Amino acid sequence: MQEKAVVLDDQMIRRALTRISHEIVERNKGVDNCVLVGIKTRGIFIAQRLAERIGQIEGKEMEVGELDITLYRDDLTLQSKNKEPLVKGSDIPVDITKKKVILVDDVLYTGRTVRAAMDALMDLGRPSQIQLAVLVDRGHRELPIRADYVGKNIPTSSEERIEVDLQETDQQDRVSIYDK
């Protein structure tokens, strides 16, 4: 797998997350009834960063949850090859019923991860609204899902892969395109 290009560096990621934070505050007229829920793994770190920025903007701490969608994926049998899935568990510190839940993920591609996340959320409560924030939207949707907040649209071919590196897991912040 060969890297073709770095499409977002650390400064570009920082700016995109700051913009998304402002958009979340503006669209929801504040964040009083909102909860950020990151989809494991990188979505959690992006959600935490958004919460930090929103806290600076609004002067309020925002609740952040972690969502494990392992058992909700429709491609589980394709990935597992007769192995038991590794379930890490979800941790959402508040009742999401009647709250605006902002799902957060690193890359939006086919929409299947988001569909699985919505199924998992509905098992935990009944939010008044679900919104979606992603760092990168690369297109190629298989389901009718659209992000409400996008850091960067990066059109790709199906022969390319987007990789998001974050300081928390990869010791650097960047988004790259690779040939498969």
Curated annotation (Swiss-Prot):
Catalytic activity: UMP + diphosphate = 5-phospho-alpha-D-ribose 1-diphosphate + uracil
Protein name: Bifunctional protein PyrR
Homology family: Belongs to the purine/pyrimidine phosphoribosyltransferase family. PyrR subfamily.
Class of this enzyme: transferase
Entry keyword Transferase: yes
Subunit structure: Homodimer and homohexamer; in equilibrium.
GO MF annotation terms: RNA binding; uracil phosphoribosyltransferase activity
Short motif PRPP-binding, span: 101-113
Signal peptide interval: none
Keywords tagged on the record: Glycosyltransferase, RNA-binding, Transcription, Transcription regulation, Transcription termination, Transferase
Disulfide bonds: none
EC number: 2.4.2.9
GO process annotations (BP): DNA-templated transcription termination
Keyword Transcription belongs to the record: yes
CDD domains cross-referenced by the UniProt entry: PRTases_typeI (cd06223)
Function: Regulates transcriptional attenuation of the pyrimidine nucleotide (pyr) operon by binding in a uridine-dependent manner to specific sites on pyr mRNA. This disrupts an antiterminator hairpin in the RNA and favors formation of a downstream transcription terminator, leading to a reduced expression of downstream genes. Also displays a weak uracil phosphoribosyltransferase activity which is not physiologically significant.
